[in-house]
Amino acid sequence: MKHLITLTILLLSSLLMCSCSRSELEPCDDYRQAMRDFVVRISETARAQNPDFIVIPQNGIELVTLGEDAEAALATDYLSAIDGHGQEDLFYGYRRNDTPTPANTTDYLLSYLRRSKEAGNTILVTDYCSRPDYVANAHTQCDAEGFVSFAAPERELNVIPASVPPHENAQDIARLSDAQNFLYLLNPENFDSRADFIHAVASTNYDVIIMDLFFNDGTSFTADEIEHLKQKENGGKRLVICYMSIGEAEDYRYYWQASWKQHKPVWLARENHSWPGNYKVRYWYSAWQELICGPGDSYLNRILQAGFDGVYLDIIDAFEYFEKQ
């Protein structure tokens, strides 16, 4: 009988603990607005230090309007906080590399992207294709829309294309709206050293470089290295933008604590099985936002200290994950 009572108490305790953990979750009434507010906070924090700092969210283009479709009222506060939009797979790569994106998906994305462009934003499109005819068509389609095109040969974004950038030029690029092309080189795994990476990127004439803050060994690029990359090989000046994920936590980043895998902070959600080591986050939690853009040793402050011209925000579309829960 004592064993039965003990077992019952343990079961009740377990249920109470589960109930408490659920009740401890901060409610979010509007996942889309919460993401907009987060991006606005990042923008305001950065521009307090550098008024010219560039902010570019990637994907999650639905946030540009306040309703359920592209014709709804514009989210003006959000649009005022950003300088452009990054969009993956617009024409190629939605299902897999070197595959045309379904026409209905392209049309859906275009309906929002056009509104963002009309509001004054620069649209950076990354299509995942390497076939020469697909690459040429991706550039042509973007030109027709007034978008800036990059055809990524690999999904891992670890390759500098062998071809010259579209609309290669020697102009000084002072604003994102000046850009006619860009390089998205997020993963430096194919480079044996920092010096090799710096040399390879510096030897290009792209108007904008989007890269990570860190090299393969986990050390961040220095302000001197970033300053060196701000000059094209032909002598023109360019912008160097830093990638930062704000909708997922990554277990290889400096902020990650080993204990989180056994004792998750309340804002840490499920692992993304498509990208092992990446975890969805409840991005409306102040504790997560402090890691990203709070005072002190936040991710954003590290980016600012390294001298980047702006930030390229990923997993903006995390709101979709929570809307489906």
Residue ranges and their predicted role:
Residues 1-4:
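Positively charged n-region of N-terminal signal peptides that target proteins for export
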Residues 8-15:
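Bacterial N-terminal signal peptides
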Residues 23-325:
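Glycan-processing catalytic domains of CAZymes
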Residues 18-19:
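C-terminal motif of bacterial Sec signal peptides marking the signal peptidase cleavage site
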